[in-house]
């Protein structure tokens, strides 16, 4: 924690101190500090508390009308005074999370070069591939423990944004701190600039990235490998989160590195963990098990297949065979249901094809099986959307599902809001209020026939901050599948619906600190059990989590000589 009563000794003074976001207090510098650090005359006379600063900042925030302007304003505070930024965000977490992350961050990525004001993190470009060690040494933060890295090729549902993708690592790490208590001094956002194939970015005179078609194949793999090795040399214990890599790279990179370094892919594993946790809560509330369900996915990319594999693992842990579990999962992409013998499937898709014996008696029109065909024949109880294609959960599809399932569970998870497969309002209306809905982006509660239905945001921010906190608390050397499974189970125990039989599927964001600590404990405990972290007692583990949990409060400063 940073509520340490001991003073912090600072070598900076004057404008240099005010220009250091991690240390700047602005108007909250005391009279003694202003004198010691040559700040007199550089600040207004009044010394304020952080709460007074928050009140002014919130008034200014409310004066902006558009979400983009609010995003830019918050980023400006972050780049000026990080302690104030995180206190403001924590005080208004439900209101501001959609601004600092999805859905607003999508537009911020698309307009990154146009709204750019100040650098944050590292931009590691392919032309500098022989100097990555030097670039890492230039990072503003020296004791880095968590890195979020992207190559900008698959930003949310928006595709290739080049270096504009940097908005995602910045936003994700903001949530590591705001939700998971990881000190911003330990975080580093990175974009690997390997070019872009987005013609709009290449033609934009404002675009600030490397103007070159994307590097691919062996050259790309060698570049990523050199980056990983350089990080290992500089920060050998750092957790690396891969973020928004394209499908063709996301799973291969995860498979290549997950047993070599401490890393995970949030799009694949984090999304899977929060989805499984939400489904476990829904099943508990309904008095059933996940292994009793039939599950259809729309979207068979790395994210969808990652969720499916996590669901299958949970089903198997409940006592059914792997083969039986796979027979209850139906993957649908643009070509229809994935079936054995289909050409051009990727390795991770091959493991999820339906066998002919399971579908030979199905009814359909034309070749293959559409989503509607699957609804009619498989009679799923759960429908999950990770397609990035808006509107594909049509009224006909949802009503067909509802025919065979009184309480359908429908998760349209695609981000941002413009890409959602169906709106909660439509799903609730089409099922006469009987569907249980969770989404990837935030939605207001739905009012149907006089009743209000809370819509859970099945957001990775419920999971990855706790994973990071747990890894840091015990200095875990790997992030294993079992650790991720424990994060899902811990999240499910926090569900108001599962606990009380009513309320929201997931806890309110105002309780995210408690959720993150609970997940951190479960993740760290499993890491110890699996031998990827040193063994400590439960009491010592709780203490380690509390000690690692950073709070946005100002510490006293004392000046030290250079």
UniProtKB/Swiss-Prot annotation:
GO biological process, one term: malate metabolic process
Site (described: Important for activity): 267
Catalytic-site annotation from UniProt: 101 (proton donor), 172 (proton acceptor)
GO MF annotations, alphabetized: malate dehydrogenase (decarboxylating) (NAD+) activity; metal ion binding; NAD binding; oxaloacetate decarboxylase activity
Annotated EC: 1.1.1.38
Cofactor(s) recorded in Swiss-Prot or TrEMBL: Mg(2+); Mn(2+)
Residues involved in NAD(+) binding: 154, 267, 415
Catalytic reactions on record: (S)-malate + NAD(+) = pyruvate + CO2 + NADH; oxaloacetate + H(+) = pyruvate + CO2
CDD domains reported for this sequence: NAD_bind_1_malic_enz (cd05312)
SUPFAM superfamilies: Aminoacid dehydrogenase-like, N-terminal domain (SSF53223), NAD(P)-binding Rossmann-fold domains (SSF51735)
Family: Belongs to the malic enzymes family.
Protein name as it appears in the record: NAD-dependent malic enzyme
Species: Vibrio campbellii (strain ATCC BAA-1116)
